[in-house]
Regions:
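Glycine-rich and polybasic anion-binding loops at the starts of cofactor/ligand-binding domains
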Residues: 1-158
Length: 158
């Protein structure tokens, strides 16, 4: 077992420094699978409306890229600009360069939440602008829960 695995294991009951102590056993970690989308207009109207309240526009107008995760499933990742990558982290982890940034800023043993995100990663995103890229519009991301009492274990890299 690697040192990072041991650190995560040792922190699986460690309380967070801030906020109430939440019992993670009250949440399930197995989410239902959702089909990927070709575009965000395929989302149900109610979900599009809710996302818009959080600033995520399903038309993607004025956006350089988008990432949407429903429960534990990355259902949409897109970039419309050259030199901009928007990827689900599970896909990005297959790329060598991602490992040099993965879990380097936030320690896996910070608390039980980081421990769980490391040991039972559902997904998350990687957003990267390549050297020389001119990204003129924002990238939008939305990670939401459709299933009640689900733990959404994510790690994001920007």
């Amino acid at each position: 077992m690697h040192e990072i695995d041991n650190k995560a294991k040792e922190a699986k009951e460690k309380k967070a420094a801030y906020g109430p102590d939440i019992d993670l056993k009250d949440y399930c970690t197995e989410g239902e699978c959702h089909e990927p989308l070709e575009n965000l207009e395929q989302l149900p109207e109610e979900e599009k409306s809710t996302m818009l309240k959080a600033g995520v526009d399903s038309s993607e107008e004025g956006r350089s890229g988008s990432y949407v995760q429903r429960d534990t499933t990355a259902i949409y990742a897109s970039s419309v600009m050259d030199g901009l990558e928007v990827l689900p982290i599970k896909e990005a982890l297959k790329l060598d360069w991602v490992r040099e940034y993965y879990w380097k800023l936030v320690p896996v043993d910070q608390d039980k939440f980081t421990s769980l995100a490391y040991s039972d990663l559902h997904n998350g995103y990687v957003i990267r602008a390549l050297p020389g890229a001119k990204v003129t519009f924002p990238v939008q991301a939305c990670l939401y829960l459709h299933q009640d009492a689900l733990s959404q274990n994510v790690h994001n890299l920007i």
